[in-house]
Amino acid sequence: MCDEFVLDNGVRVIAEYIPHFPSVSVGLWIGAGSMYETEEENGLSHFVEHMLFKSTQRRTTREIAVEMDAIGGQVNAFTAKECTCYYAKVIAEHLERAVDLLSDLLLGARLDEEDFEKERGVILEEIAMCEDTPEDLVYDLLAEAYFGDHSLSRPILGTHEQIASVSREALVAFRRKHYRPDNTVLAVAGQYDLGSLKEMAQRYLGAWRADGIPQEPVASEGCEGQYITRKKDIEQVHMCLAYPGVGQYDDDLYPMSVMNNLFGGGMSSRLFQRIREEMGAAYSVYS
């Protein structure tokens, strides 16, 4: 059974108490991912994620890195097509320190020009790393082929050209548009006291205010019969196939998940047994 409540500013809080866990995980989920970007904004969700781990009004970049290490905790973030998540895992007694740090990243980031330029270089290297990792690159090509001109077709990292030319002002504007209390979920799992959690949420997130309304992405049905190839000087060919599936609220979601597991979910799956075990044609195959 989960505890759920909403702050006056719209931040939603959902928590699950797990008594046999000595630790607690906490995440701030923002409805900002690459599917919410325009073509000119491509890569900004991920760029913002990087920038929020730079200096804040209360912490230096190093202090952010050291704070969780000092108590044996973990802190990190990721950007997806649908969202960006900032999360931490700590011993239960340090829950407030985790909420304090994550809320400081979210609300207190300085977004300095010097940090912006340094992080631009880091992300350009990350894009180059993806280009050198064909098992990652092939998924970007698959999305490009399947979704065509829709925002879902664009890479989460952005392109080299886009990141090399984007301005700090564009990043600040994107953050202002999408990082809003009514577009945020605070999720907690592990040991916590509900009354204390409500006080923490109000103390660290309750005063947050934002203006404007982010643009919602247009639904996409995908394309038909598209394919993309990219020639690389490597030893193997990496290939992906995509077909229309079902929505997350569709009654067929769970039957399809079971079917997917039978088809390519493990060593006993049909794909693995046929392509690897019987044919010896590939090392890795899955769905």
Regions found by a protein language model. Give the residues of each.
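A common structural microfeature
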Residues: 12, 23-25, 44, 48, ...
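A generic structural signal for well-ordered coil/turn residues at beta-strand boundaries
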Residues: 1, 22-24, 82, 223-224, ...
